[in-house]
Amino acid sequence: MAGKADLGHTGISDNIVERQIFVPQPNNAWSFTQGLMCGQASVVVVLLVFIKFFVFSEAPPSSGAAKSKKKDISGVIVKREAKNTDDDDGVENGDSAKLATILEKTYYDVNNHNPESLDWFNVLIAQTISQLRCEALLSDNIYHSLNDFLETSDLPDFMDKITLTEIDIGDDFPIFSNCRIQHSADGTGRLEAKIDVDLSDTLTLGIETRLLLNHPRPLTAVLPVQLTVSMVRFSGCLTVSLVNTNDTDFVGTSKEENSSGGGTALMFSFSPDYRLEFSVKSLIGSRTKLQDVPKISDLVDSKLRNWFSDRCVEPKFQVVRLPSMWPRSKNTREPVGAGKTEKVNGNE
């Protein structure tokens, strides 16, 4: 009985073993794919975290951070000038110290330095004036410009249309000499250049018109008038200086000038002892003509002198705003043949 039991037990065990042997193994292919995808995803996450926190910086959360950044940037620029104080005396002392530093570093003594000739400057000015004359004479541009100005000008009722009869823009050039740097006489301590100017040339403008007598009825009488004005000589002392347009002494009267912001401007004026000579020729009448009437010459001469004195003679002055001198790509030029020359040299 025991043997049978053993045999039976052995048979059962064999069956169990056989069943265990023939049980199909589970498929692990899907588990491997999941592991591979999870591994790649984890690598991508680690790379993103590294790039975010170690490569890119965070954006400033508020305007306060931007202000602090500006303060940090301001510390990068080396400022060698002394700090300005709030009072006027401190500002004046700072400007005086700045001018003294400029004179010291340029080795210029305003009290003992000899006047300088401006031969090189005369050449540059002559080239500029020559170019302007060529442009003015090109296609009679100066005639059309003056004629358009006269046609659009408001004339009094007793004057007929003005017609141009003669234009002469000269062929000589001004001579600048005896340049010296001095402190301004107004007590501000500003540096200014005193330059002697001399021009001996003939600049002529001739016109003709008619004086209309409209009383007691329109066009009761007509008086033809021909007038030719020539400037033959000018000499004087030119004062030139650089000013800041934000200064109260140089603030413009128009809103457009004030809204354009601050900057550097060129201020110039002429001394009251200038010399200006005119030659005025007149011809009045139709049948019986009066030539070179002294009263007309004196009137024209006085009007031209007053016009010049009211604009350019001390204490009046002219202020011309200077453009920005900072190099810009839009202002960059090169010779026309430069590119072709480089290509030829490269091919060789």
UniProtKB/Swiss-Prot annotation:
Residues 328-348 are annotated as: Disordered. The chain crosses the membrane at residues 36-56. Residues 114-323 form the SMP-LTD domain. Keywords: Endoplasmic reticulum, Lipid transport, Lipid-binding, Membrane, Transmembrane, Transmembrane helix, Transport. GO terms for biological process: mitochondrial genome maintenance; mitochondrion-endoplasmic reticulum membrane tethering; phospholipid transport; protein insertion into mitochondrial outer membrane. Residues 57-348 are cytoplasmic. Residues 1-35 are lumenal. One of its GO terms (cellular component) is endoplasmic reticulum membrane. HAMAP family: Mmm1. Homodimer. Component of the ER-mitochondria encounter structure (ERMES) or MDM complex, composed of MMM1, MDM10, MDM12 and MDM34. A MMM1 homodimer associates with one molecule of MDM12 on each side in a pairwise head-to-tail manner, and the SMP-LTD domains of MMM1 and MDM12 generate a continuous hydrophobic tunnel for phospholipid trafficking. PANTHER family: SMP-LTD DOMAIN-CONTAINING PROTEIN, TEX2 PROTEIN-RELATED. Belongs to the MMM1 family. The SMP-LTD domain is a barrel-like domain that can bind various types of glycerophospholipids in its interior and mediate their transfer between two adjacent bilayers. This is Maintenance of mitochondrial morphology protein 1. It comes from Clavispora lusitaniae (strain ATCC 42720).
